[in-house]
């Protein structure tokens, strides 16, 4: 999936820059945003192949961003990053995969490759189509 465009959204600039460097070294084109509103703007204006999204951000958290993205372009896969192990089930249902912050670059790359390699309409990591009703 090299050459794919990934949108990374995280209010922590250092983590964002590290993920950007890891992804670019692996051949991805990376767009970054430090807040949900900017991320949604980039999402709307660009062709995006996948999203790597932080859960805990001020003003607009990752759940609200994922919900807006699903309404507009439900086919775009979303990975949710969090330092929290227990995320609300309604948020987890909106995304294709979750990744615990602090996991290494290899885990990020493996989950991203798997996520963007899925074809439209395939089930998410929990066996349900992302954004579907439970």
PLM segments and residue spans:
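Active-site residues of response regulator receiver
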Residues: 54
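Acidic catalytic/metal-coordinating carboxylates
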Residues: 35-38, 61-65
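Output/docking surface of receiver
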Residues: 94-116
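Conserved phosphotransfer cores of two-component systems
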Residues: 44-46, 68-75, 93
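Acidic, metal-coordinating helix/loop segments flanking the phosphotransfer/catalytic sites
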Residues: 32-50
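Conserved acidic segment of CheY-like receiver
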Residues: 3-14, 19-23, 51
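Receiver (REC) domain active-site loop signature in two-component systems and cognate sites
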Residues: 57
């Amino acid at each position: 999936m090299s050459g794919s465009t990934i949108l990374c959204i995280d209010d922590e600039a250092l983590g964002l820059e590290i993920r950007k460097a890891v992804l670019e070294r692996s051949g991805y084109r990376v767009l970054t945003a430090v807040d949900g509103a900017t991320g949604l703007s980039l999402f709307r204006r660009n062709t995006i192949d996948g999203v790597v999204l932080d859960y805990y951000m001020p003003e607009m958290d990752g759940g609200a961003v994922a919900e807006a993205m699903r309404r507009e372009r439900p086919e775009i896969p979303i990975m949710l990053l969090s330092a929290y192990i227990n995320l609300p089930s309604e948020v987890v249902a909106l995304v294709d995969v979750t990744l615990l912050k602090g996991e290494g670059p290899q885990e990020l790359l493996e989950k991203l490759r798997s996520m963007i390699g899925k074809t439209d309409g395939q089930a998410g990591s929990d066996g349900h189509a992302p954004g579907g009703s439970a």
